[in-house]
Amino acid sequence: MYGLINIGFGNVISGDRVIAIVNPESAPLKRLKDEAKDEGKLIDATYGRKTRAILITDSNHIILSAIQPETIAQRFKQSMIEIEENLNKVR
């Protein structure tokens, strides 16, 4: 239960759908990106900037972000903390 996560430049994704945040430099991930593009499952949220993170979703969509994977992971963590705090207020 993560809510919406900002992945840069006003783009947000459903945190619950993301299964991995990875660095795009390896050859297998470059192939994965190319395959997703061919299948119409590539979402480019970089606004023309260098891809610094690849997010893989449970629907096999590949999302490109210009934000570092560590930064996105920190945003996931912060989102989880905020949701936990809000749930504790309700309880």
From Swiss-Prot:
InterPro entries: RemA-like
Protein name: Putative regulatory protein Tlet_1629
Signal sequence, start to end: none
Family per record: Belongs to the RemA family.
